Every structure is written in structure tokens, then in C-alpha cells.
Design a protein with these regions (language model features):
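Membrane-interface "cap" regions at the ends of multi-pass membrane proteins
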Residues: 1-60, 173-176, 189, 195-201, ...
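Helix-loop-helix module between adjacent transmembrane segments
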Residues: 75-173, 241-245, 279, 287, ...
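Residue-level recognition of transmembrane alpha-helices
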Residues: 9, 49, 77-80, 162-166, ...
């Protein structure tokens, strides 16, 4: 393991924990801890929503799909971009307005209970149970991804890597609450976008350019250049339907609730969609031209 890599990872992890400690002293009440006191700017709102949404999938899952399936995998990107835009356009601002005016609801279950005047609290309980159940699995997958990264990078045992990663994430989350989570996601979003811009450019340069890359792919497997190859109309609809998930993902919706003013939502939407489009295009390019790179290097 090269020393610069170790130093970089250590500095990153220390920064995450430091953010948690900083916001520990900036947190005054439950609203601050759960929703950041509704004081987030449009930039942090947008990038934290994007980073928490895409997470490791943008760096591993989507490139992997493009690598194995070819350009047909871009259908899922279209669905995600359209779904995210509609979510920002139709859900974000009304949700910010309603949650603030309906007894200052600071969670999704609170909002539903207040919005529909549920005096039995049944709606609040059911919503909370659903979120707890499914997001336990969702969060677990993120922790597993982090452990796999530590395992490969630092040659740690998987169980040790899982414990280290979990302790770091849980530490800054419990120390700084929502503000810490949002600001760490903001930093991660910047790093993700930079990596997904630089990496495909390096790969394309290494293989001799876009045209050369396309020729390498065409000679190895022409079907990877066919946007409908190996799928069907139902298959394409299924890929496009991924974008429907945006309308019900609590970790994205709470970002809309926490922006400091609803009038800043349009700016946040512009920042968020710009980040998403650039990052997804970079992710697609990594997987697609990564296939050409592997062939050109003779890697098995």
C-alpha cells in the first residue's frame, strides 16, 4: 500500500469525524439534530441529496452495468435523470412549504400525520416502520460497500473493515446529526463528480481517443454499441422506471425540507441536476470506455 493513498484516506476519515464534532457544538435542539434547523443553502442541499442518492452505486454499479451490457445501460440513466428532475420540480418546493407550516414537521412520518390530521397516529407509526425496515437494509448495503472498499484498499479482514467503516460513519452521524451528514455528503458529492470527470478523460486519452475506443469495442462485441440490444420494450420501461423511486425516498425528501427558504429551491434544482447529469455521464463513460481499456491492455 502506497503511503500517499493511506494518508489521503486517513485525512478524509479524520475530516468526516471533525465535521461531526464541529456540528455537535452547533446543535441546540431536536430540529437542529434531525433537520439542520432548516438552514442549509442550495449548494449543500443539492449535492448532499445527489451524493446520498447515488452513493457507491454511481461509482461501482452503473459503470459495472455499462461494462457488462454496453450502451443499453444508458436507459437507466435517462430514467434517473427524468425522475430526479420531476422530483425537484414538483415535490421539492411544496414539501418544504407544507412541512414548515404544518406544525414544523421535521420528519416524513410527522409530515404525513400532520398533513392528513391523523389523530390516531397510525399513519405516523406505519410510515416510520416502513422506513425503518427498508432503510435498515439500504443502510446495511452502504456499510457493506464501504467495508469492501477498505478490504481492497487496506487489505483488512472484511469484518475489521466493516467495523472501522461503521464506527466512523456512526460517529459523525450521532455527533453532528443532520448537519454533519449533509456536509459530509456535500464533500463526497464534490469528490465523486471530480473523479467521474477526470477518470473517463484519462481512460479515453490512454486508449487513443473516443473513435479508437469505439473501434475497440465494435471489434470485440458490436452489440455493446446497440442501445436496444439484448433487451425488450418491457426491459427498457423497467430501466426507465428506476426514476420513479425518487418520489418516495426519505433520505432525498428530507433534503428538500431542510433548505433555508423555499425560494432557493430553483437554484438548488439547477445545481443538483447539473451535478447529476455530469456525474452520470462520467459514470457511463467509465464503464463503457473501461471495457475498451481492459481489452487494449489485455487484462483478463
Amino acid at each position: 500500500m502506497e503511503t500517499p493513498v493511506i494518508i489521503s484516506f486517513a485525512a478524509y476519515m479524520i475530516t468526516m469525524v471533525a465535521i461531526g464534532i464541529y456540528f455537535y457544538f452547533e446543535t441546540d435542539d431536536l430540529s437542529d439534530f434531525v433537520l439542520g434547523g432548516r438552514r442549509l443553502g442550495p449548494g449543500v442541499t443539492a449535492l448532499s441529496a445527489g451524493a446520498s442518492d447515488m452513493s457507491g452505486w454511481l461509482l461501482l454499479g452503473l459503470p459495472g452495468m455499462m461494462y457488462t451490457d454496453g450502451i443499453v445501460g444508458s436507459w437507466i440513466a435517462v430514467g434517473l435523470i427524468v425522475g430526479a428532475y420531476l422530483n425537484w420540480h414538483y415535490i421539492a418546493r411544496p414539501l418544504r412549504v407544507y412541512t414548515h407550516h404544518l406544525d414544523d414537521a421535521i420528519t416524513i412520518p410527522d409530515y404525513f400525520s400532520n398533513r392528513f390530521e391523523d389523530r390516531t397516529h397510525l399513519l405516523r407509526i406505519v410510515t416510520a416502520v416502513v422506513i425503518l425496515l427498508f432503510y435498515t437494509l439500504y443502510t446495511s448495503s452502504g456499510l457493506v460497500g464501504g467495508a469492501k472498499l477498505f478490504e481492497a484498499t487496506f487489505h483488512l479482514e472484511y469484518s475489521t473493515a466493516l467495523i472501522v467503516g461503521s464506527v466512523i460513519i456512526v460517529s459523525y452521524t450521532f455527533l453532528g446529526g443532520y448537519n454533519a451528514v449533509s456536509w459530509t455528503d456535500f464533500i463526497q458529492g464534490i469528490l465523486m463528480m471530480l473523479a467521474l470527470i477526470v477518470t473517463p478523460l484519462v481512460v479515453i486519452f490512454h486508449i487513443g481517443g473516443i473513435t479508437e475506443g469505439l473501434e475497440i469495442i465494435r471489434s470485440a462485441d458490436p452489440s455493446k454499441l446497440d442501445i436496444i440490444s439484448g433487451t425488450s420494450f418491457i426491459g427498457i420501461l423497467s430501466l426507465l422506471a428506476w426514476g420513479l423511486g425518487y418520489f418516495g425516498q426519505p433520505h432525498i425528501l428530507v433534503r428538500f425540507m431542510s433548505i433555508r427558504h423555499e425560494n432557493e429551491m430553483e437554484r438548488a434544482k439547477t445545481i443538483g441536476m447539473s451535478w447529476m447529469i455530469l456525474s452520470i455521464l462520467g459514470s457511463l463513460a467509465v464503464g463503457f470506455f473501461g471495457f475498451a481499456y481492459v481489452l487494449s491492455e489485455g487484462i483478463d
